[in-house]
Amino acid sequence: MSTMNLILMGLPGAGKGTQAQKILEDFDIPHISTGDIFRAAIKNETKMGLEAKKYIDAGNLVPDEVTNGIVRDRLAEADTKNGFLLDGYPRNIDQAHALKQIGEELNKPLDGVINIHVEPAVLVERLSGRFICRTCGATYHKLYNKPKVEGTCDVCGGHDFYQRDDDKPATVKNRLDVNIKLNTPLIDYYGQEKLLYNVDGDRDIDDVYKDIKKILDNL
């Protein structure tokens, strides 16, 4: 296949970052995450970057047209000639329509949207399992990375652990609910556009990637 213009979707904790890394190792395309391109546009003082900075400094949300402009500028760069892996954009249907238009203008239409699906209950368990040693700051996970001796820190031998507010189940569930509301219309839209590929993310990292690679090899 000559190009590979992709979007990677998935809820927090679904393993998007890990799978993005694996895609980049196998395919010669840049990983374009909205956070990174915003920071770069602001640092380089591009027209759109300066525009975005005004909103961010005032504590306001950056409007779609500015976000779309920053994405368009990034997709017009030379390193996207073989394709790109978009992460964190689009966030809503208006942005999805804008991306379609950008793709037509730059002759870089989307080839596929990979959605890593994991049930929210599993994600709550993954994301809310983290706890920290109060004495030395070592981090543990109740499922994936327990201390060797229960209740005792491997690093300093301390017994006092705590959980950050961000990692508490109610907070995690709230964050997931917000993301589900954002993602569901996009998943429906890309399903209708015949661009959507759902991958079961509740498995070993390598098994998930095998499925993703199979999809990409056949695009």
Curated annotation (Swiss-Prot):
Is Protein transport one of the keywords UniProt gives this record?
A: no
Signal peptide annotation = none
Q: In which pathway does it act?
A: Purine metabolism; AMP biosynthesis via salvage pathway; AMP from ADP: step 1/1
Gene3D superfamilies xrefs? P-loop containing nucleotide triphosphate hydrolases
The residues that the entry says bind AMP are: T34, R39, N60, L61, V62, G88, Y89, P90, R91, Q95, R164, R175
Q: Disulfide connectivity?
A: none
Q: What class of enzyme is it?
A: transferase
What ranges does the record give for the region NMP, renumbered to this chain? 33-62
The family database entries (PANTHER family) matched by this protein are listed as: NUCLEOTIDE KINASE
Q: How does it assemble?
A: Monomer.
Protein function = Catalyzes the reversible transfer of the terminal phosphate group between ATP and AMP. Plays an important role in cellular energy homeostasis and in adenine nucleotide metabolism.
- Provide the family line: Belongs to the adenylate kinase family.
Protein known as: Adenylate kinase
Q: What is the lineage of its organism?
A: Bacteria, Bacillati, Bacillota, Bacilli, Lactobacillales
